[in-house]
Amino acid sequence: MIPRTLFSPEHELFRDSVRTFLEKEAVPFHGQWEKQGYIDRKLWNKAGEAGMLCSHLPEEYGGLGADFLYSAVVIEEVGRLGLTGIGFSLHSDIVAPYILHYGSEALKHKYLPKLVSGEMVTAIAMTEPGAGSDLQGVKTTAVLDGDEYVINGSKTFITNGFLADLVIVVAKTDPKAGAKGTSLFLVEANTPGFDKGKRLEKVGMKAQDTSELFFQDVRVPKENLLGQAGMGFAYLMQELPQERLTVAIGGLASAEAALQWTLDYTRERKAFGKAIADFQNTRFKLAEMATEIQIGRVFVDRCLELHLQGKLDVPTAAMAKYWGTDLQCKVLDECVQLHGGYGFMWEYPIARAWADARVQRIYAGTNEIMKEIIARSL
């Protein structure tokens, strides 16, 4: 196998600490979290104490000033252990950068240290009942009234929505201006008129709280506008490459874990007097998956390298997201097949990982949208 060269000894020490933390604080409880539909709120505070949240933020805002590889380590370890209920990456690598890049100094100092410590859990509210991939179709509005914006509308499929203390809301400040009329706002969960709907029951990722959000005459200070009014769509487009890279990183880690589980299972499971791994079809399937995962790993690591250099462009990030998650789902399906009937039993991690993987091709921009982005760049 091709050795990975991106990570320093310091990164690997951090990886060891992340793995130890997750094996102690998350793995024993994840099954219960799947039943209740959300993870224990205390895990966020413990993760903050362990330095696992928003490590990339500058020290002046409570972070470590670390590079993105520390975020990648957390994503990979969460993915390898099948802990899909944990929304750390969305909080650290998707929401926090919006505040860092577009928030005022007052907003940064008010909120970012609380994100680092786990005192506040965050979410981003883009998707609506009638607007998914088409963000220009958002109907939620924000109308300036004196020194406040008044927000009305609804959101759905919001990850971390149930536990969120702070939400970035995508809303139209000028509904007639299309994409140029979109703005981003910070809304605290205890703001009057902001209600959380039911937690949504999903096919997979059952421990990840996913909720509906409702806004009825929600008043927020105009200072809670991120950046400039009407620039929200542009900000979203600038930040999406990192979001899509995080999905690809997690997808490859999940595929690698699934292959290892399947190697172990097929070596132990016997049929017709010999191990399943000794059958030619099994060996060929394992060889094919190992090769494709290796190809995916090299590509995603190169994307990580480009991202560290500030050179990861939108089409390449789209390639990583689409190809990485397609591969993840392909590998998980093959691994379930090699597990036979046991692969369809919820008590086996391969079954849960298979169910969890399917949505990877849908969120963060569907894979069809990814192909459209790639095609436009050709």
Where does each model-flagged region fall?
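Short Gly/Pro-enriched turn/cap motifs at secondary-structure boundaries
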Residues: 88, 115, 130-133, 157-160, ...
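Long, acidic (Asp/Glu-rich), low-complexity accessory segments flanking structured domains
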Residues: 213-235
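Short Ser/Thr-interspersed hydrophobic loop/turn segments at strand-loop and sheet-helix junctions
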Residues: 51, 74-79, 171, 187-192, ...
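Flexible, small-/acidic-enriched active-site or ligand-binding loops
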Residues: 137, 190-221
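Alpha-helical interface subdomain recognition
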Residues: 1-86, 102-107, 114-119, 132-135, ...
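A short, Trp-centered hydrophobic/proline-enriched beta-strand micro-motif
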Residues: 118-126, 170
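Helix-loop "lid/cap" segments that line or gate small-molecule binding pockets
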Residues: 93-102
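A short core secondary-structure module
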Residues: 148, 152-196
